[in-house]
Amino acid sequence: MSLTPLCEDLPQFLQNYLPNAGQTENTIVPFVTLTYAQSLDARVSRGPGVRTTISHPETKTMTHYLRHHHDGILVGSGTVLADNPGLNCKWGPDPAANSPRPIIIDTKQKWRFDGSKMQELFIKRQGKPPIVVVTSEPIIKEQHVDYAICPINDTTKLVDWKKLFEILKEEFNIRSVMVEGGANVINQLLLRSDIVNSLIITIGSTFLGSSGTEVSPPQTVNLKDMSWWKGITDVVLCARLADD
């Protein structure tokens, strides 16, 4: 499916929130962009595991423009199990070459590359094979898949995000990562101003209701350096997380 042309004013609007090589050369972690689409009532889907369209086609094109500017694209296993996404880039003169490397958080090792949309696109040379994040040696090692073994944080009992991003840069040369979801991943990283460099949120013109899957971090999060863009039906907020 072809993309709607990118709105002419979006590149300039996004410019200050995109990865810059100079910003990551002397750091041990990649440039991290946290980006997602939500409804007016802060829902990212109609319910757990329910694939939901929120964005207008023009902001879907923006998503692929963002993918073009990142080395990796990270999602949780719940998202890939529910949506079976391709996670490739369809924007630009050579989208396949500029597609980000999919990075899948799969600590329970439920997801398989074999038979997935990602594998289909990889075979067609329209996408790249994934890096799967696990907490111990994988039970099954699939062909073309790389594995990042990342410890659990002793305090939170969740993925050690700082260590993971260090591994992605050091072992896989991932210098910029676009985090797309799902809600659990987003809620965790909204609290990490020490890791997240940019926040880009598309807000669709819809309410998804109280049964929807909500983005709501467990504590107050303040933003800074905010900019707004208005489209046909969506608005886009670009910002940075304020320090605690």
Curated annotation (Swiss-Prot):
The gene is RIB7. Disruption phenotype: Cells lacking this gene accumulate a 6-hydroxy-2,4,5-triaminopyrimidine derivative. This is 2,5-diamino-6-ribosylamino-4(3H)-pyrimidinone 5'-phosphate reductase. Disulfide bonds: none annotated. One of its GO terms (biological process) is riboflavin biosynthetic process. NADP(+) binds at T79, D83, V159, G182, A183, N184, V185, I186. PANTHER family: 2,5-DIAMINO-6-RIBOSYLAMINO-4(3H)-PYRIMIDINONE 5'-PHOSPHATE REDUCTASE, DIHYDROFOLATE REDUCTASE FAMILY PROTEIN (AFU_ORTHOLOGUE AFUA_8G06820). It comes from Saccharomyces cerevisiae (strain ATCC 204508 / S288c) (Baker's yeast). It catalyses: 2,5-diamino-6-(1-D-ribitylamino)pyrimidin-4(3H)-one 5'-phosphate + NADP(+) = 2,5-diamino-6-(1-D-ribosylamino)pyrimidin-4(3H)-one 5'-phosphate + NADPH + H(+); 2,5-diamino-6-(1-D-ribitylamino)pyrimidin-4(3H)-one 5'-phosphate + NAD(+) = 2,5-diamino-6-(1-D-ribosylamino)pyrimidin-4(3H)-one 5'-phosphate + NADH + H(+). One of its GO terms (molecular function) is NADP binding. Its EC number is 1.1.1.302. Belongs to the HTP reductase family. It is an enzyme of class 1 (oxidoreductase). Pathway: Cofactor biosynthesis; riboflavin biosynthesis. Catalyzes an early step in riboflavin biosynthesis, the NADPH-dependent reduction of the ribose side chain of 2,5-diamino-6-ribosylamino-4(3H)-pyrimidinone 5'-phosphate, yielding 2,5-diamino-6-ribitylamino-4(3H)-pyrimidinone 5'-phosphate. SUPFAM superfamilies: Dihydrofolate reductase-like (SSF53597). Homodimer. It comes from the Eukaryota. Keywords: NADP, Oxidoreductase, Riboflavin biosynthesis.
